[in-house]
Amino acid sequence: MTETTENVVITIPDKTSFTFHEAATSPSEGEEFVVGHFRELTVKISGSSTSREIKFYAVDENGEKTALSGTNKTDFQLGSSTLNTNEYWDFDIAGLFKVMFEVVSVTGDVTVKGIVVS
């Protein structure tokens, strides 16, 4: 998408990837993604962990976390956390400030990566 302001042309990317956790082996809040102009997020949870719990959050300008529900792409169930791995989740993030995926517990390693689109 391209926006023009007077004589300045600004190109806004339509799609980008982001890593929340890379092979995390201990509980962690991970990286927060600043939503900006993006509207949709697809997250892949993978890794060799034999058990894990991941909670999904929206984070406001004051750093306050609120549970964020997403749709599991396998069974189309809504959820704000998961105990599974090797799955994809979709989130509507339009209007949010930041999103994060907290690894509450893990045995082994877990990776959480996302692709956002505007």
UniProtKB/Swiss-Prot annotation:
Transmembrane segments: none annotated. This is SPbeta prophage-derived uncharacterized protein YomS. It comes from Bacillus subtilis (strain 168).
